[in-house]
């Protein structure tokens, strides 16, 4: 080995260490983010199960402010989206960009800063949110010092990702990198605009926007956080990992390009549908509704492209639980992207607005789409990152799949029924014009569905524990390895 390193260093003029480093991918950063994704997945689901229990048994607040639902709910959403989902995106994007560009990432140090900076953001959120430090904006609760750290860390990530594409050895930029790139650029734009504040203390600030403009900026951010963080980035996972696991090319590469541009153009305009029946100008609400309906076409185009990649390999779904995770994730993506445009129609929204139907919708997208595609990708990555041919237990993956799927179905079905029931009860009017039901009566009627929701969430959490055990067993049975960069210029 030393002779090889010395000869390589003689040819390149580099030190033996640098020469060896140039011949392998940086899989350490992928390994770190992959393990972090599993850890934060367990934590985020644990908090989710606890607050679901609080909705069923309010005594679990224990009269302690930092254990109250109002403080733990944003912790749950931030952990699920930015800790679990974020680490999954970072791990997969670093894996994909290196292999499709057939080069090592441009800077190991910046990548390391990205990892530790992001973990610091997560820990800061885990401390500050239960203590009550919040901006009060959904998905953007973190106060200005943490927002600055997010921005700096994000810039480091962007430099590494786009810098690696800049030094690629393959002329073509694979479509998965397009989706990752759009996710990185859009989230940076959204975060910078929505996080514009006037500090009023070390952990207190006021938005530079006011009134309805503040609401519009918030839901331009909130909707597109879903559109680019929870959609575009994870579509990058779809376009790399499903073909790899299925051992089939993307069904239609041309459709993937059309899918990309249609999605990128349309998503940015749909935010106003979150503000139907508010002080937002009616024309703006209608504009958001129209673009939401248009979104159905590119969303379903991408879903069909992913599912049809299995053409000629449908039998693999019987025997491959990892592929099953990925395809069922696409099914939930299809459900969520049909339901979203439908709920943006003002007539439908008049029933669904402020009800638990919204909870069913977002959890179908987050647990079903984001969760399942992330789990499938992690099951693909973990054995390869630790020098193993497969996960420790395929049977455990099978059990995880069915436990999590049943949990999601319980959760979503309960919240769908509860949401429609709430909407109908709230709009029910007596002949004299008075409300038929008080708000408290609607809460009482919802209670059984909260219990079912808790059971569904508990099953999903148990699935995460099974995954964590499987990952630990796989990692301890192997050892960390960095893959060798192939000499032939072909997509990996």
Label the model's feature ranges:
Residues 208-217, 352, 357-359:
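Active-site-proximal inter-transmembrane loops
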Residues 479-492:
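Short, highly charged, low-complexity non-transmembrane loops/tails of multi-pass membrane proteins
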Residues 18-32:
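Cytosolic juxtamembrane amphipathic/interface segments immediately preceding
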Residues 63, 135-138, 278-281, 349-353:
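Membrane-interface helix termini and inter-helical loops of multi-pass transporters
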Residues 14-21, 442-446:
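Short, charged/polar, low-complexity loop and linker segments
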Residues 201-209:
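Extracellular/oxidizing-compartment recognition motifs
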Residues 2-3, 31-133, 144-165, 177-202, ...:
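Hydrophobic cores of alpha-helical transmembrane segments in multi-pass integral membrane proteins
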Residues 1-12:
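N-terminal acidic, proline/glycine-rich, low-complexity intrinsically disordered segments
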């Amino acid at each position: 080995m030393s002779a090889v390193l010395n000869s390589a260093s003689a040819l390149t003029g580099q030190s033996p260490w640098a020469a060896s480093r140039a011949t392998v991918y940086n899989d350490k950063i992928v390994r770190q983010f992959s393990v972090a994704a599993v850890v934060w997945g367990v934590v985020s689901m644990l908090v989710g199960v606890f607050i679901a229990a609080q909705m069923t048994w309010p005594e679990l607040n224990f009269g302690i402010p930092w254990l109250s639902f109002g403080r733990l709910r944003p912790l749950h959403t931030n952990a699920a989206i930015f800790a679990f989902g974020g680490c999954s995106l970072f791990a997969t994007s670093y894996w994909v960009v290196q292999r499709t560009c057939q080069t090592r990432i441009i800077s190991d140090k910046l990548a390391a800063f990205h990892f530790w900076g992001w973990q610091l953001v997560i820990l800061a959120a885990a401390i500050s949110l239960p203590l009550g430090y919040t901006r009060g904006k959904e998905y953007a609760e973190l106060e200005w010092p943490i927002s600055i750290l997010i921005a700096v860390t994000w810039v480091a990530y962007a430099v590494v990702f786009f810098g690696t594409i800049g030094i690629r050895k393959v002329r073509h930029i694979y479509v998965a990198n397009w989706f990752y790139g759009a996710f990185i650029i859009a989230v940076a734009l959204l975060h910078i605009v929505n996080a514009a504040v006037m500090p009023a203390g070390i952990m207190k600030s006021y938005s530079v926007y006011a009134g309805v403009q503040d609401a519009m900026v918030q839901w331009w951010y909130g909707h597109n956080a879903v559109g680019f963080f929870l959609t575009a980035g994870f579509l990058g996972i779809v376009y790399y990992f499903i073909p790899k696991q299925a051992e089939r090319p993307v069904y239609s590469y041309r459709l993937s390009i059309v899918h990309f541009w249609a999605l990128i153009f349309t998503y940015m305009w749909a935010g106003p549908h979150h503000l139907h029946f508010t002080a937002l100008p009616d024309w703006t609400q209608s504009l958001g509704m129209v673009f939401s309906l248009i979104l159905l076409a590119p969303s379903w185009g991408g879903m069909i492209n992913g599912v049809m990649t299995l053409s000629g390999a449908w039998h693999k779904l019987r025997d491959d639980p990892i592929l099953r995770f990925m395809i069922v994730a696409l099914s939930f993506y299809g459900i969520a992207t049909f339901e979203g445009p439908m709920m943006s129609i003002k007539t439908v929204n008049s029933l669904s607005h402020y009800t638990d139907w919204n909870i069913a919708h977002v959890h179908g997208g987050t647990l079903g789409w984001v969760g399942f595609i992330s789990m499938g990708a992690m099951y693909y990555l973990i054995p390869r990152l630790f020098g193993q041919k497969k996960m420790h237990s395929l049977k455990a993956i099978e059990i995880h799949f069915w436990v999590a799927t049943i949990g999601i179905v319980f959760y979503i079905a309960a919240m769908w029924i509860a949401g429609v029931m709430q909407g109908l009860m709230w709009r029910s009017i007596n002949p004299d014009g008075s409300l038929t039901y008080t708000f408290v009566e609607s809460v009482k009627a919802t209670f059984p569905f909260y219990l079912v929701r808790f059971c569904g969430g508990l099953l999903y959490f148990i699935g995460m524990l099974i995954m964590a055990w499987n990952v630990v067993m796989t990692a301890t049975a192997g050892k960390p390895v960095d893959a060798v960069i192939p000499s032939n210029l072909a997509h990996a």
